[in-house]
UniProtKB/Swiss-Prot annotation:
Subcellular locations according to the entry: Membrane
Binding site for heme: C458
GO molecular function, one term: monooxygenase activity
Protein name, UniProt field: Cytochrome P450 82E3
Positions of crosslink type Glycyl lysine isopeptide (Lys-Gly) (interchain with G-Cter in ubiquitin): K254
Record has Iron as a keyword: yes
EC id: 1.14.14.-
Any GO BP: nicotine biosynthetic process
Major location (coarse): membrane
Organism: Nicotiana tabacum (Common tobacco)
């Protein structure tokens, strides 16, 4: 993180005020506090501890190193807020089982207000009636197994189209394919089709979608940058906007919202026309479904129906277009670097499905090794290595330590899922470990929670797994892979809160099936 001079000046100006607020909250607890990492300053805490020190690894890796030194439960301060980091089975279980309701709130972040529809997006909303109603609507009506089943042919058709596009890029035995870019295009096009019924293809889509893609990338950057208000939540840092973040967020939000507003208006007009004619119309997409289920008074909490729909659409795009593509990208890179596992997966598909047709979703249940691969990739590279931060609404106890109200929780899932006490050879890619190990994704096995656990677990898990299994199955079945240099792909991870590879997956591919199948 880089801290501008003007930000530091503003920080120093209000040091004494913050110090007063900080010390006023301090009360001696009945139980011991967790270990706190050294090096913190009065008031600002450990803000500079994670500054640009030449270590460009993901934050989860850095916090994992601190866990090795200070234990699986420790704290530090980012300005005023106290941050609790947990990475052991016992501590994770305490947080998401014993104290699940207590830790169900979300901390306030500036991007949630200016980019997240004033925290109307489900993953940003505080635990309460709005969150419960919205989550129920999404799980039962939008992302339920029965609803996703109706979109099965959409997923298959989109993946097939993308596979054919990939096939057309093959030029002899020396053409290099950027698989990372291909996966991003596939997942973005798929979720846009399912949400808004639009057919998007890079370079051929409408101008609105292209503008949204740029704004979406800006959102990802802005949501991960250090913002003074997040560490010192007083109105001054919104009004003065030392770092220029508020201005940038407002500009980016305007571009994002204009696209969603246009999609929404198109669907409202279509719905009105259908009601006039008295027919059901064409197949419903996600916006159609939400419009039919949500009245203007349905959710309340100060949000309009249109705001909630747009916030819900944004949440779905965020999870599906970025997170799913990121995970499949890591999975394919691991398989390309582990050709024995790739060949074993290909042999399983050849045996169970054959080479005369493509894998379908109904085949996945029989592809045991493929399922193990997906689980192993999620173990090594969880979509949210620290999950989305939680915040406790009252004092509680975690692993015998007193945790005061208002503490922000970082659950280091990446560290947990590579714990040598829980996993043999934890850093090794070994899908076989899940063949004999009966473990699922639902968050009740506290050594393995790639989609989180408890009330705030990811509602898009079923969709993500469907797309990941089917996409990887097609890529495994359809092609052989090698790197341009015949050396393993670089798996180096970039800085930030996600596990994003620094270098894209660039490979040379050759088809495995008959030409007429592509």
């Amino acid at each position: 993180m880089v801290f501008p001079v003007e930000a530091i000046v503003g920080l120093v100006t209000f040091t004494f005020l913050f110090y007063f607020l900080w010390t006023k909250k301090s009360q001696k607890p009945s139980k011991p506090l967790p270990p706190k990492i050294p090096g913190g300053w009065p008031v600002i805490g450990h803000l500079f501890y994670f500054d640009d020190d030449g270590d460009d690894r993901p934050l989860a890796r850095k916090l994992g190193d601190l866990a090795d030194k200070y234990g699986p439960v420790f704290t530090f301060r980012l300005g005023l807020p106290l941050v609790l980091v947990v990475s052991s089975y016992e501590a994770i279980k305490d947080c998401f089982s014993t104290n699940d309701a207590i830790f169900s709130n979300r901390p306030a972040f500036l991007y949630g207000e200016y980019l997240g529809y004033k925290n109307a997006m489900l993953f940003l909303a505080n635990y309460g009636s709005y969150w419960r109603k919205n989550r129920k609507l999404i799980i039962q009506e939008v992302l339920s197994a029965s609803r996703l089943e109706k979109f099965k042919h959409v997923r298959f058709a989109r993946i097939q189209t993308s596979i054919k596009n990939l096939y057309t890029r093959i030029d002899g035995n020396s053409s290099t394919i950027n698989l990372t870019d291909w996966l991003e295009e596939l997942n973005f096009g798929l979720i846009v089709k399912m949400i808004a019924g639009k057919n998007y293809e890079s370079g051929k889509g409408d101008e609105q979608v292209e503008r949204f893609k740029k704004a979406f990338k800006d959102f990802m950057i802005l949501s991960m940058e250090f913002v003074l208000w997040d560490a010192f939540p007083i109105p001054l840092f919104k009004w003065v906007d030392f770092q220029g973040h508020v201005k940038a967020m407002k500009r980016t939000f305007k571009d994002i919202d204009s696209v969603f507003q246009n999609w929404l208006e198109e669907h409202i007009k279509k719905r009105e026309k259908i009601m006039e004619v008295g027919t059901e119309g064409n197949e419903q997409d996600f916006i159609d479904v939400v419009l039919s289920k949500m009245s203007n008074e349905y959710l309340g909490e100060g949000y309009s129906r249109d705001t909630v729909i747009k916030a819900t659409v944004f949440s779905l795009v965020l999870d599906a277009a970025d997170t799913v593509a990121l995970h499949i990208n890591c999975g394919m890179a691991l398989l390309i670097n582990n050709q024995n596992a790739l060949k074993k997966a290909q042999e399983e598909i050849d045996t169970k499905v054959g080479k005369d047709r493509w894998v379908e979703e109904s085949d996945i249940k029989d592809l045991v090794y493929l399922q193990a691969i997906v689980k192993e990739v999620l173990r090594l590279y969880p979509p949210g290595p620290l999950l989305v931060p939680h915040e406790n609404v009252e004092d509680c106890v975690v692993s015998g330590y007193h945790i005061p109200k208002g503490t922000r929780l970082f659950a280091n899932v990446m560290k947990l899922q590579r714990d040598p006490k829980l996993w043999s050879n934890p850093d090794k890619f070994n899908p076989e470990r899940f063949i004999a190990r009966d473990i699922d994704f639902h968050g009740q096995h506290y050594e393995y929670i790639p989609f989180g656990s408890g009330r705030r677990s990811c509602p898009g898990m079923t969709y993500a797994l469907q797309v990941e299994h089917l996409t990887m199955a097609h890529l495994i079945q359809g092609f052989n892979y090698r790197t341009p240099t015949d050396e393993p792909l670089d798996m180096k991870e970039g800085a930030g809160i996600t596990i994003r590879k620094v270098n894209p997956v660039k490979v040379i591919i050759t088809p495995r099936l008959a030409p007429e199948l592509y």
